[in-house]
Regions:
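Cysteine-centric redox/oxidoreductase cores and disulfide-bonded domains
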Residues: 82-157
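Extracytoplasmic thiol/disulfide redox context detector
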Residues: 4-84, 156
Length: 157
């Protein structure tokens, strides 16, 4: 009987943990809102980093999910840049976007860094060379995308 009572007590004690989160207690709301590019639509933003193994592992699942979104939902990838050594991989993503080959090379770049271990995520020369080779582009065009004014604007957001 004591064991049964103890089991019931343990079982019901977890119910106290299932509480609705409260603003100011469990999380803080911000005064600033984030503007979206898709007005009147739900915008899902993935913050990722090419050096992150978890982002790499999650990417195929996100792609599948993004292929089947409702019409009122958009999906956008944004490279995270909390530290200086993450800037170069963010530049790589934005360069792929600028060059119009992000859909073709995004997954392959993840593979080159994590699966094939061809270079580090912050090796600018290697990233430019890899994009030039795999995008079948002129090296100066890729370098220009890496160093453009629009790149600086994207990085400062």
């Amino acid at each position: 009987m004591k064991k049964l009572l103890l089991m019931i007590l343990i079982l019901f004690s977890t119910l106290s943990l299932a509480v609705e989160p409260m603003p100011g207690v469990n999380f803080k709301t911000t005064k600033n809102t984030i503007s979206t590019e898709s007005k009147n639509k739900i915008e899902v933003i993935e913050l990722f980093w090419y050096g992150c193994i978890h982002c790499y592992n999650m990417d195929p699942y996100l792609d599948k999910w993004a292929d089947n979104l409702p019409k009122d939902v958009t999906f956008k990838r944004v490279p995270a840049i909390p530290r200086k050594d993450w800037v170069e991989s963010a530049k790589a993503y934005y360069a792929l976007e600028t060059l119009g080959i992000v859909n073709k090379l995004h997954e392959k770049l993840f593979d080159a860094i994590h699966k094939e271990k061809l270079f580090k995520h912050n090796d600018t020369k290697a990233l430019i060379s890899w994009i030039t080779l795999n995008g079948k582009l002129d090296k100066k065009k890729v370098e220009s995308a890496f160093n453009s004014f629009s790149m600086k604007a994207k990085l400062s957001r």
